[in-house]
Amino acid sequence: DHGVMYGVIDFYKAAKAAGIKPILGCEIYVTPGSRFDRDNKKGEARYYHLILLAENNEGYENLTKIVSRGFVDGFYYKPRVDFETLREFSKGIIASSACLAGEVARNLAVNRYEDAKEAALRYRDIFGADNFFLELQDHGLSVQKAVNQQLIQLSRDTGIPLIATNDIHYTQPEDWEAHDLLLCLQTGKKASDEDRMRYEGGQYYLKSEEEMRSLFAAVPEALENTAKIAARCEVEIRFHELKLPAYDVPEGYADAASYLRALSEEGFRARYPEEPAALRARMEEELAVIGRMGYVDYFLIVWDYIHFAKEHGIGVGPGRGSAAGSVVSYCLGITDIDP
């Protein structure tokens, strides 16, 4: 997907069900300036394409952070990220120079070899020598063939390895016409319009190994490197597993559990000045259950935003589910009905 990861989970599940190894990634948009910029220098590209693949679970987490930052901080026509973001979240990620819209290829297409070289070396510096690749594609376009020759030379000059891919937008060769019509629907154009978005050549399908070997017979190492990347990528998404953010505990407390206990004790004395033994025992049992189930951070997070809302005059609900009958919830001020 371009700039988003909406389809990752469905793709992951479908691939696993079919016995196919899922390789998770995103074709992101990289701005040459800051992600906070909302204008461009004259003659400067608004963004470039870059392929990012998750090599492992750390890489997958970093990839989601990169994509999220593109929307939160960098959205301007597209969800863009900058080099600062890439450096911050580069671990566990394998990157490639992408298609003709990538920074390296775009410079090569206009005969700016040194600029392309500088860009390639920058990406290698960000992701590491073993984690950045120059990407060859061949969809029968003359400009692509010319750029490929320069990419091969660039690989020789820099030592950055090559890979060979195909930009896939549909499955079978005969699907090109349906894809073209869908593009017209998406962009509000007629098929007969001259000035419209189109994928020339009809070669954006899932090509076989034989076709790829024929296209890139002159650079077999590019295909070998592509296979090596596929072998390296191992992401295991564990569903139905509790994943909660860690709460930042203030100084003076050993851990989240001790902070939750302190807040609960304070609230207990405020809610029940007589401190009835039966309710104290009930609170102790609830705290023990919360700890065993791994919900300590969750209770602190809920307490934090409920407390913030009440302090700022923001209305909150009365609570629902089992938490509405919890003494701890009542003592924390999450609920206001004495259970």
Regions picked out by a protein language model, each given a short descriptive name:
Residues H2-P339:
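Phosphodiester-processing cores and adjacent nucleic acid-binding clamps
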